[in-house]
Amino acid sequence: MAKTVAYFYDPDVGNFHYGTGHPMKPHRLSLTHSLVLHYGLYKKMIVFKPYQASQHDMCRFHSEDYIDFLQRVSPNNMQGFTKSLNAFNVGDDCPVFPGLFEFCSRYTGASLQGATQLNNKICDIAINWAGGLHHAKKFEASGFCYVNDIVIGILELLKYHPRVLYVDIDIHHGDGVQEAFYLTDRVMTVSFHKYGNYFFPGTGDMYEVGAESGRYYCLNVPLRDGIDDQSYRHLFQPVIKQVIDFYQPTCIVLQCGADSLGCDRLGCFNLSIRGHGECVQYVKSFNIPLLVLGGGGYTVRNVARCWTYETSLLVDETISEELPYSEYFEYFAPDFTLHPDVSTRIENQNSRQYLDQIRQTIFENLKMLNHAPSVQIHDVPSDILSYERTDEPDPEERGSEDNYSRPEASNEFYDGDHDNDKESDVEI
């Protein structure tokens, strides 16, 4: 039976700019959406311009002091916030940039709206490529992430769902989400990531398993450099199958960070776009309500290819290898294809013996789980959002410029892998 897929896209979200030389580029969202449109994938989805999250929404997880700071700070007044900048870890990796709070509001609102639509059975799958900012903590920013839209979305899902499974395939450990739900069995977190050699964020050892009621409801799969499609599949599919069999989640949140692809600027894995997509396809195959989010990904053209391909998998549509012409066509030179070779010369340091050892340890931990913990459901709080949305604009039409209040950053275009912006010679 065909799935109903809701797709959330804010036309302004790709026009925010972390600053010259910064590897995180919201502009990748504009590229992704352009491909989704030009491949005609929007015809297979319900397209929403998302809700913007309020301070109140963000404070469901974050501290009021921190969110109040995010709303008040700007590049023009940040000199007066020296103490707060340090306290909230805002500075180099997480800079203050124009429209910072508005950016957080837009990507968080989309994840929250996706969760609410899943709760109300408006859709079977909700997609927000702008979300998935998994490093943000209750009291501070971290790793290019300010507001943890994933945690806020999961808190909304928990109003209706007794058990939510969180799966993270970003190359970086999903530390902010793990920390938020470390003490509960209502959410099981499963993260596949690079671990060791001081790789950010430095957490995600196999022996971090949760505590108190959440003991054994946190599962980490620490990987080494150079993992390829075959090795990843050897771990991912059996682990996810066992987790779903044991935990029986009623909803799944999947963070699809694309920095686990080969050739990523900040990554050291060797997954192909097809291999990354295979994980999405596998999770979808369980037919459990699914919230799909973005995350990391710093080689912009490959992020757009990856998330477009995964959108096609989620709507069961085969798309051509040749990219359609679009306003961003030149980004995809020289091949202009959906699945270029992204393999690198990084050696796969994940031996079969190492992978089997991880698998064995994980399966032993899973045996410690109570099968599908039951939960006492109290009165369900009212939904944050109600939508009888009949006013959706045609996504094929650009619409008036009034809908695009934030112009594209003039230094957002760049050439090649080492030029981050046309005004910068900083190599990342």
Curated annotation (Swiss-Prot):
GO MF annotation: an example: protein de-2-hydroxyisobutyrylase activity
GO cellular component, one term: cytoplasm
Residue segments, region Disordered: 386-428
Thylakoid in keyword set: no
Organism for this UniProt entry: Xenopus tropicalis
Protein name: Histone deacetylase 3
The organism's place on the tree of life at top rank: Eukaryota
Uppermost EC category: hydrolase
